[in-house]
Regions:
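Rossmann-fold NAD(P) dinucleotide-binding segment
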Residues: 40-101
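Helical "substrate-binding/catalytic lid" subdomain
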Residues: 152-267
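Hydrophobic beta-strand scaffold residues
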Residues: 16, 36, 101-103, 144, ...
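Rossmann-fold dinucleotide-binding core
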Residues: 77, 82-162
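Hydrophobic residues within alpha-helices
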Residues: 5-9, 91, 136, 177
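NAD(P)+-binding Rossmann beta1-loop-alpha1 motif at the extreme N-terminus of oxidoreductases
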Residues: 1-52, 75, 111
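Residues in the short beta-alpha loop(s) of Rossmann-like NAD(P)-binding domains
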Residues: 21-22, 56, 126
Length: 269
């Protein structure tokens, strides 16, 4: 996700400095014209605004701690990772302790929208930084929303991904049932596309699911992580989540069966 986002910034004329925990992963961005920093702090020191995209709450916290020595008053730190609200608040505290501003901006969208500059940013935190970031956000995405205090963006993203994950399990069950009924799966996709339940996700994922192919646009391990975090959020609020909880069990089973690094649509297995 971070690679196409950075490339879009470069293509729009921004000076970009990159750092990655795995140095080889930064090579495509360096080849596209970015400077390579030796450390996270060095990348922040070289940048007015730093965007961070990592895969887990633990990684997001570790990167913030590694980056803080490069932050200072006047700089901005935008974490676009999907984390829980508590982690985002902890990162905000780390960043703000340096005098820098913080914005959480988790994205709705996967690899293809990232490549196309069509992500949706769910932002919360320092509104002045949000306004400063409007141009790069528009370069990397098709929409961005300011949702208030730190934590609100994280919560919105978990709600969105919980809905997406639950929809996918229902879709997978429908495809499987149609196959067992000797119904043509391609006809099923056509019927769905013409009715009230038509969905871009179903149209995109249906053909590859029918073909048994699961190239990872959004890895299953990340979907299961987001289901877990959404269910934990609901537990805090004493909100029943029977559908999401049942869907999460299917993702956990798929992960145990070796589908962690396949697309989340591999839950159909």
């Amino acid at each position: 996700m971070g690679v196409p986002m950075a490339k879009n910034l470069i293509n729009a004329g921004h000076e970009v400095t990159v750092w990655n925990r795995t140095s080889d992963a930064a090579k495509p961005v360096v080849d596209a014209g970015a400077a390579l920093a030796a450390t996270a702090a060095e990348a922040c020191a070289a940048s007015d605004v730093t965007f961070v995209m990592v895969s887990t709450p633990e990684a997001a916290t570790a990167v913030a701690n590694a980056a803080k020595d490069g932050l200072s008053a006047g700089k901005g730190y935008v974490d676009v990772s999907t984390v829980d609200a508590e982690t985002s608040s902890a990162i905000a505290e780390i960043v703000r302790s340096t005098g820098a501003e913080f914005l959480e901006a988790p994205v709705s969208g996967s690899k293809k929208p990232a490549e196309d500059g069509a992500l949706i940013f769910l932002c919360a935190g320092d509104e002045t930084l949000y306004r400063r970031c409007s141009e790069p956000l528009e370069t990397m995405g098709k929409a961005h929303f300011f949702l208030g205090d730190v934590g609100q963006g994280a919560k919105m993203k978990l709600v969105v991904n919980m809905i997406m994950g639950s929809m996918m399990t229902a879709f997978a069950e429908g495809l499987t049932l149609s196959e067992k009924c000797d119904l043509d799966p391609e006809t099923l996709l056509q019927v769905i596309s013409l009715g009230a339940i038509a969905s871009p996700m179903f149209a995109l994922k249906g053909p590859t699911m029918n073909a048994g192919a699961f190239p990872p646009a959004f890895p299953l391990k990340h979907q299961q992580k987001d289901m877990r975090l959404a269910i934990a959020l609901a537990d805090q609020l004493r909100q029943e989540m029977p559908v999401a909880a049942a869907a999460n069990e299917l993702y956990k089973r798929a992960a145990r069966d070796g589908c962690d690094d396949e697309d989340f649509s591999a839950v159909i297995k």
